[in-house]
Design a protein with these regions (language model features):
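Conserved hydrophobic/aromatic beta-strand scaffold that supports enzyme active sites
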Residues: 27, 35, 68-70, 83, ...
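Conserved, structured C-terminal
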Residues: 1-12, 86-252
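Acidic, proline/glycine-enriched N-terminal capping motif
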Residues: 1-71, 77, 203
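Acidic active-site catalytic centers that drive phospho-/nucleotidyl reactions
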Residues: 29, 81, 177
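Short amphipathic beta-strand starts and helix->beta connectors
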Residues: 14-23, 71-81, 111-114, 157-165
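Charged, low-complexity, helix/coiled-coil-prone segments
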Residues: 43-55, 79-86, 129-138
Length: 252
């Protein structure tokens, strides 16, 4: 997938992995996705720069909160969609694997002239723990994980590694996405798999779960010719950025 060798399924098969994620917890390796850090002199500068590329409010995003976003092109289509979070002194983004090279180039071309650096994090892995028991699994490593709300982001220790964790996912279920230093990825993953409710799940189940939840996949459901309104993504565009809003326009 996108030039990466990825497991479509493990020994129990797609259906089993799908159902297990819905009833317990599935663990997905999504390290092929792009992880990017945007950093200006401060968050406000970085946020204002990113707002020149997307129809979302960035400046009002609270510290340690995450938001869904997408780039638009000059024809009103979607260049790519992604997640972004306010980490205090920088913005952390997760972009699609199939688009990450284009996204990073686009960000550099447009943000670096505004004084914002764009760093591709090639030294971190990314996994997703999804399903109703995922909180219970992580509580064994960090009991306060239960205080995290949907779309909260925090830095927590798992198996001795400093991990960046968001309460979010691509399944429509409760879950967490976990960015791990590459050298600790195997240790952290193995530790989570030791929990009796956790099983590995592949790309097949990831696709069926997101379809069941009605979540878009770039390149299949949305692309550069699809408008956000036609895609049912009007909810993601903030009123302040649209016609008549106090920050209207000024994005492609």
């Amino acid at each position: 997938f996108a030039g990466y060798e990825m497991p479509l399924q493990y020994k129990n098969g797609i259906m089993s992995e799908h159902l297990h994620t819905r009833s317990h917890a599935g663990l997905f390796d999504v390290s092929h996705m792009g992880q990017v850090v945007l950093r200006g002199n401060d968050f406000k500068q970085t946020a204002k720069a990113l707002e020149t590329l997307i129809p979302m409010e960035v400046e009002t995003l609270n510290v340690d909160r995450q938001r869904y976003g997408f780039f638009t092109n000059s024809n009103g289509g979607i260049f790519d969609d992604f997640m972004f979070s306010n980490r205090g002194d920088h913005i952390y983004m997760v972009v699609n694997a199939s688009r990450k090279e284009d996204d990073i180039k686009y960000l550099r071309e447009n943000l670096e002239p505004l004084g914002v650096s764009v760093r591709n994090l090639e030294n971190r892995a990314l996994i997703a723990l999804q399903g109703p028991t995922s909180q219970r699994v992580l509580e064994e490593h960090f009991p306060k994980i239960s205080k995290m709300r949907f779309m909260d982001v925090s830095t927590i220790p798992i198996a001795g590694a400093e991990c960046w964790v968001s309460r979010s996912g691509y399944t429509g279920d409760d879950g967490f996405e976990i960015s791990i230093p590459s050298q600790a990825a195997e240790i952290v993953t193995t530790s989570l798999l030791e929990h009796e409710t956790v099983e590995l799940a592949g790309l097949g189940a990831r696709d069926s779960l997101r379809l069941e939840a009605g979540l878009c996949l770039y390149g299949q459901d949305i692309d550069a010719t699809t408008s956000p309104v036609a895609a049912g993504l009007r909810w993601a565009m903030h009123t302040s950025r649209l016609s008549g809003g106090y920050k209207e326009g000024k994005f492609p």
